[in-house]
Structures are given as structure tokens and as C-alpha cells.
């Protein structure tokens, strides 16, 4: 409660709930965004980010998929069950066309009759790189608009425009190479994938993917920092009370939202 009697909510709580909601929308475990956030802060601390940058990284990690509804209709048309598709492909390197194509031919729409499946695959491959760039550009713009309503800092809003980029410049929507991306984005790109592979295959799987994709999707220096103390870093995402860990990990003093800001928050 403020001096004027206006109630205040903690920004970390609101953004944490949004992160959980986007996890559900992507068919991921409900604490994917939280675990990713915890990994981001741990890696960020180890590379020497200050509290201001760590706070921006913290909120960026939780809001990464804030614009996920922007392309829902298009994705449903392309993928059928777009939530299932997002869940089943979360482990793939989207920058490796051969790996992605092999997954589609081996796994996509396997529950459909052969003729239907063939038609669905043909339709899926109309999703050209140009269409993907357009779609992800819309996602980023929606995320940035929503984030501005929450009152997060300009570095978070700016960072949301890069969350689908890659270190090698082969990402989307703009193909910005790693050295020109904010460091908080590069940390998030790595930690988002570390969470998926650690959850699916354990520390060795996370380590293997990090090394294989260094210089491609990931910043090699960040990969080296992770691999130097892999188990200790991954341990922060394995606690029994992840929500409490999330709130305790918020860098700097807790930030609040007053009631009018809360009612403007995306929901």
C-alpha cells in the first residue's frame, strides 16, 4: 500500500505469472520461463553483469514469449496443433534446415492418414524464411508494446526485438549477428536452450548442445563460461520451490506496479 492508499503489486510476481502463461501457450512445462530466468541471472552474474543489467535480463527472460499470440492463427493453419508443434520442436536448432526437415519428415502429423499428412507437410513448407521473418517481426512488435505497458526499462523493450536472433546472424527477424546484439539477449538465447535440454536430457545433454551450437546459435564466450562450471549453474534451476527462488533472485530492490499500471498490464 502506498502513502496515497494505492495498492502495489510486485512487478516480478506479475511478470512471473505472464511467463507461466506463455509456457502454457507453447505447450511447455509451466516453469520453463522461470527456470530460464534463474539460469540467465546465474550466467549473467558469472560474466560480471551489474545489477541494472541483471534486472533487465531477469525481466527479458520472463517476457521472451509475450508476443506469442501474434501469429497464432497463422501457426494453427501451418502446423495444425500449433501448441503441440511448439512443444515437440522446442529442442531443435531452427537454424539447421537439414535437422528441422528431417524432424518434419519423421515426426510431423504422424497421427494423420498418409494423404492428409502429405498435404500438411507440403503446406508446412510454404512457411518460407521470408514468411518466418514477417511472423517473428510481428511477435516482437507485440511483445514490445505489451512490455511498455508494464513499465519495464527500455533495455528490456529493445531486447524483445532480438529474442529470435542467433549469434551467427542467421536468425530472425533481422539477421543481426551476435556482436551487435545486447549481451542480455545473447545470455537469454543460450539459457533458454539450456533449460530445454537440461530438462529433457540432464546436464550432459545441455553441455553437448551448448558446445555444438557455439558460434552458431550461441555466443562462444558465454558457452565457455557455462561449460566451466556447468553443474553449479544448472543447479539453480533444480530447486524444489522455483517460484520462491524467482522472487528471491530478482536483482536489486523489488520493483512495484501501482494499481492503474496493473490494470493496464497485458492479460
Residue locations for each model-derived region?
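Histidine- and acidic-residue-rich, metal-dependent catalytic cores
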Residues: 2-267
Amino acid at each position: 500500500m502506498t502513502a496515497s492508499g494505492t495498492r502495489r503489486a510486485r512487478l516480478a510476481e506479475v511478470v512471473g505469472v505472464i511467463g507461466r502463461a506463455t509456457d502454457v501457450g507453447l505447450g511447455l512445462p509451466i516453469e520453463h520461463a522461470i527456470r530460464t530466468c534463474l539460469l540467465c541471472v546465474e550466467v549473467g552474474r558469472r560474466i560480471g553483469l551489474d545489477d541494472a543489467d541483471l534486472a533487465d535480463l531477469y525481466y527479458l527472460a520472463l517476457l521472451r514469449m509475450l508476443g506469442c499470440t501474434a501469429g497464432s492463427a497463422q501457426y494453427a493453419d501451418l502446423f495444425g496443433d500449433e501448441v503441440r508443434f511448439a512443444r515437440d520442436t522446442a529442442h531443435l536448432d531452427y537454424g539447421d534446415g537439414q535437422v528441422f526437415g528431417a524432424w518434419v519428415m519423421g515426426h510431423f502429423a504422424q497421427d494423420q492418414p498418409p494423404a492428409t499428412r502429405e498435404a500438411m507437410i507440403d503446406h508446412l513448407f510454404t512457411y518460407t524464411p521470408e514468411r518466418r521473418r514477417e511472423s517473428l517481426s510481428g511477435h516482437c512488435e507485440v511483445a514490445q508494446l505489451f512490455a511498455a505497458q508494464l513499465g519495464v526499462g527500455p533495455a528490456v523493450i529493445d531486447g524483445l526485438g532480438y529474442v529470435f536472433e542467433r549469434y551467427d546472424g542467421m536468425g530472425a527477424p533481422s539477421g543481426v549477428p551476435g556482436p551487435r546484439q545486447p549481451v542480455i539477449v545473447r545470455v537469454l538465447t543460450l539459457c533458454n536452450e539450456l533449460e530445454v535440454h537440461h530438462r529433457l536430457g540432464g546436464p550432459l545433454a545441455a553441455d553437448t548442445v551448448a558446445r555444438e551450437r557455439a558460434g552458431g546459435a550461441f555466443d562462444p564466450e558465454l558457452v565457455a563460461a557455462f561449460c566451466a562450471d556447468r553443474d553449479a549453474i544448472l543447479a539453480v534451476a533444480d530447486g524444489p520451490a522455483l517460484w520462491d527462488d524467482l522472487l528471491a533472485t530478482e536483482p536489486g530492490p523489488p520493483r512495484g506496479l501501482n494499481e492503474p499500471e496493473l490494470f493496464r498490464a497485458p492479460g
